[in-house]
Regions:
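Conserved alpha/beta core of the MobA/IspD/sugar-nucleotide pyrophosphorylase nucleotidyltransferase superfamily
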Residues: 169-215
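Short, charged/polar "capping" segments at the starts of alpha-helices
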Residues: 55-64, 258-260, 330-334
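Phosphate-binding/switch loop-helix module in NTP-utilizing enzymes
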Residues: 290-317
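Walker A (P-loop) phosphate-binding motif
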Residues: 4, 213-256
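Phosphate/Mg2+-binding loops and adjacent switch elements
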Residues: 312-373
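Nucleotide and nucleotide-moiety/phosphate-recognizing core
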Residues: 2-168, 177-191, 265
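C-terminal accessory "lid"/substrate-recognition subdomains
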Residues: 213-215, 243-244, 263, 273, ...
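N-terminal phosphate/diphosphate-binding loop that engages ATP/GTP or pyrophosphate donors
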Residues: 238-293
């Protein structure tokens, strides 16, 4: 197929999120909608339709804060489409965009599937060796079809219109009606097909995105005050993560200075004599002491550790993703940004909270390794 257009489904009530998903912040200064749009533009898609449902405020925000900031050439490739039939969910958005779309086929990307990649759509098109199809729809590891990540012909719009006058306006029902649907095995792409339904899903998806291009993934443990229990949380996490097979590093800030050597040792004497750096290697551990003019970058230290993941312990706001430690009933003193914070832990509830944290971190690490080495 010569040209593939892109439909971004950005509308929807987002009742579980409390705000439009499309405008949620993402990494690199992007929002979820600008992130999806950039994928289409970077793939040189010349026909991108953004479905906003019937949300005029959302459409205005996307136009003024995103589309108007693009180059003239990029702006010509993007159109906002409002639902011509109100309150029909994703199927209404699909109908409204297909009904006006000039391209021979459209990939559909839900705005709450931030790890979906354009390359997958082109791969799926290549796998179908004939043109007798109305839709190409992947199925996930669970065996369930994923119509929000499918490819559709515009001429099925008339069939979808007939469905919208009925009671069942689900995308899965629509697939049964339109027929000639090619199913694609996408069981190896569970993370790409995952979507963000709850705020917790969003927080951990951002955690993955923040860590995706780091040499060493990290997670910060912060607290607004001393003696809150940061070190207790860190040591508990280290123990539990090591137990499930992850090698863990710890970086800690100390603005008051510290001592890691013993008085009178050879390395201590060499350092006091003026050596800019000393190192010692034993059978089971290695230590390096470096003289600096100012405090070293904590982030740089995390990126040079030979481990799977680093925990950064600090009293500052930390580096996303962040776990914040509080005393019981003191959540009003939180210092981290809610968008960067994946968890809030009360020191008295470690037995309850740590296993869930470890599970999320394991899932993040598995997804990171799959995306880096697949």
């Amino acid at each position: 197929m010569d040209k593939l257009g892109l439909i971004i489904l950005a509308g929807g009530l987002s009742t579980r999120m409390g705000q439009p998903k499309a405008l949620l912040s993402w990494v690199g200064g992007e929002s979820l909608i600008s992130h999806a749009l950039r994928k289409g533009l970077d793939a040189d898609v010349h026909d991108i339709l953004i479905s906003i449902g019937d949300d005029e405020q959302l459409g205005h925000a996307i136009q003024t804060h995103i589309i108007d900031t693009l180059s003239n050439d990029e702006q010509e490739k993007v159109s906002i489409v409002r639902d011509s039939i109100e309150r029909c969910g994703p199927l209404g958005g699909l109908y409204s965009t297909l009904a006006v779309g000039p391209s021979p086929a459209y990939a559909v990307m839900a705005v709450d599937m931030p790890f979906m990649e354009m390359d997958l759509y082109f791969d799926w098109l290549y796998q179908v060796d004939h043109n007798d199809w109305n839709a190409i729809v992947p199925y996930s590891e669970s065996g369930k079809s994923e119509p929000m990540a499918g490819i559709y012909r515009p001429y099925i719009a008339s069939l979808i219109q007939s469905i919208l006058v009925g009671e069942n306006v689900s995308l899965h029902h629509a697939l049964d009606v339109i027929g000639h649907v090619e199913s694609i095995d996408a069981t190896d792409f569970s993370w790409e097909l995952s979507n963000i339904n709850r705020f917790e899903d969003y927080q951990w998806a951002r955690a993955l995105a923040e860590n995706e291009f780091r040499r060493v993934p990290l997670i910060s443990v912060v607290a607004s005050k001393r003696k809150t229990g940061k070190t207790t949380v860190v040591t508990r996490l280290v123990s539990e993560l090591q137990r499930v097979g992850l090698s863990v590093g710890v970086v800690k800030s100390d603005k008051h200075g510290f001592h890691m050597d013993h008085e009178g040792t050879d390395t201590d004497l060499a350092y006091k004599a003026g050596a800019n750096a000393v190192a010692i290697a034993g059978p089971n551990e290695t230590a390096i002491r470096i003289r600096t003019k100012e405090q070293s970058s904590l982030y740089d230290l995390t990126q040079h550790m030979p481990v799977d993941i680093v925990i950064l312990e600090t009293r500052s706001q930390g580096i996303a993703p962040i776990i914040e430690v509080t005393k019981e009933g003191h959540t009003e003193e939180l210092i981290s940004d809610a968008m960067d914070r994946v968890a809030t832990i009360e020191i008295g509830k470690l037995d309850q909270d740590v296993p869930e944290l470890v599970r999320h971190i394991q899932e993040m690490m598995r997804s990171l390794n799959g995306r880096r080495y697949c």
